[in-house]
From Swiss-Prot:
The lineage of its organism: Bacteria, Pseudomonadati, Pseudomonadota, Gammaproteobacteria, Enterobacterales. It comes from the Bacteria. Gene3D superfamilies: Glycogen Phosphorylase B. It holds the Pfam family UDPGT. Pathway: Carotenoid biosynthesis; zeaxanthin diglucoside biosynthesis. This is Zeaxanthin glucosyltransferase. It is an enzyme of class 2 (transferase). GO terms for biological process: carotenoid biosynthetic process. Its EC number is 2.4.1.276. The gene is crtX.
């Protein structure tokens, strides 16, 4: 049995996806230890998974609060500050992980695509590592918009020029992080590199996004595996919570995720739009609103405001999901064929929203939209059965992709052979 280190950026959705994968590996007899700054310890709620804190000098307890605040407001100067914090974390991990891997006697490393330090250190120490895309894959292709870009997919010269120009702007913004990657690659004696997408595993790359939900890709590596959602494999069945009282009024679930749930003004717009169509609204703010804000929103008829909801239960009962475009929420909605109205706010959410529209499984709107315009889009989604019908193909693809168990099989195969695991190959699981 193997001992894996898990390296993720300090954000809930990324840690949660890797924790679900870690739990499956633990159930198979392996050990998994997350290694990061102290503050992400509270994000790991499984007693069977280890945690090893590093970087207390530069990232002391409480330091993550500032990073999460920047991530919740990632526009203008805050974006550059957030990128600088990402660079600081990668720098810290590149310095701390070699000793941690040796002290913990790590056999292999599971690395989120967004945190390259785990990949660099694993390669330098000769450890096998597996890259995981918990959000949109960051793999680049010449005629494909970057994951963070809001563009529709196109093959015209104008589209390709737009993609290329936006890539240059993105690379300029990320230059501080790029310098950290380049400096540590040189210090460790690795082949020159400076960008995230140059740090992915040559053995296996795992993605939650299936091709049926992506733009047409032509240049993914042979070791790239689209396994679908990384969910708990030994989780209890969906709760019996009933969130909607009427079967006659439209049932709408709205959530902006764990980082963006503070957007009271946007929630007010959603509430007004639901009033206009006389819909029932379940609004989950993930603990980000004040009591007075919750009370004000809940004054609206047929509106429930909660910190957290059982998302699977809510989406299985809802007829429409209003979301920021987070990968996990979108995949859950597809699983229940619940049409999507995306209000992308940051990170890869514009890219996810573009894919929702491209595949005809929902609509997108600006965060500055009016309640009347939002209501008009909601009516279209609720009355046009084509959205649900188009979801059926993607739903089937997600359920056949293999999920967490397939990802664990791939990881075990890497550890068993030390060779690249090619897409479509059988996965040996006995170690």
């Amino acid at each position: 049995m193997s001992h894996f280190a898990a390296i993720a950026p300090p954000f809930y959705s990324h840690v949660r996806a890797l924790q679900n994968l870690a739990q499956e590996l633990v159930a198979r007899g392996h050990r998994v230890t997350f290694i990061q700054q102290y503050d992400i310890k509270h994000l790991i709620d499984s007693e069977t998974i280890g945690f090893h804190s590093v970087g207390t000098d530069s990232h002391p307890p409480g330091a993550l609060t500032r990073v999460l605040h920047l991530a919740a407001h990632p526009l203008g100067p805050s974006m550059l500050k957030l990128i600088n914090e990402m660079a600081r974390t990668t720098d810290m991990l590149c310095r701390e992980l070699p000793q941690a891997f040796n002290d913990l006697a790590v056999d292999g490393v599971i690395v989120d695509q967004m945190e390259p330090a785990g990949a660099l250190v694993a390669e330098a120490l000769g450890l096998p590592f597996i890259s995981v895309a918990c959000a949109l894959p960051l793999n680049r292709e010449p005629d494909m918009p970057l994951a963070v870009m809001p563009f529709e997919y196109g093959t015209s010269d104008a589209a390709r020029e737009r993609y290329a120009a936006s890539e240059k702007i993105y690379d300029w913004l990320m230059r501080r992080h790029d310098r950290v990657i380049a400096e540590h690659s040189h210090r460790m004696g690795l082949a020159p590199r400076q960008k995230l997408h140059q740090c992915f595993s040559p053995l296996a790359q795992i993605s939650q996004l299936v091709p049926e939900l992506d733009f047409p890709r032509k240049a993914l590596p042979a070791c790239f595996h689209a396994v679908g959602p990384l969910r708990e494999t030994h989780a209890p069945s969906t709760s019996s919570s009933r969130y909607f009282t009427s079967s006659e009024k439209p049932r709408i679930f709205a959530s902006l995720g764990t980082l963006q749930g503070h957007r009271y003004g946007l929630f007010k717009t959603i509430v007004k739009a639901c009033e206009e169509i006389d819909g029932q609204l379940l609004l989950a703010h993930c603990g980000r609103l004040t009591d007075s804000q919750c009370e004000e929103l809940a004054r609206s008829r047929h509106t429930q405001v909660v910190d957290f909801a059982d998302q699977s239960a809510a989406l299985s009962q809802a007829q429409l999901a209003i979301t920021h475009g987070g990968m996990n929420t979108v995949l859950d909605a597809i699983n229940y064929r619940t049409p999507l109205l995306a209000l992308p706010l940051a990170f890869d959410q514009p890219g996810v929203a573009s894919r929702i529209v491209y595949h005809g499984i929902g609509k997108r709107a600006s965060r500055f939209t009016t309640s009347h315009a939002l209501a008009r889009q909601m009516r279209s989604l609720l009355t046009n059965v084509d959205f649900q019908q188009r979801m059926a193909k993607i739903q089937t693809a997600l359920r056949l992709a293999g999920g967490t168990m397939a990802a664990a099989d791939i990881i075990e195969q890497v550890m068993c052979t030390g060779q690249p695991v090619l897409s479509g190959s059988g996965y040996a699981t006995a170690l």
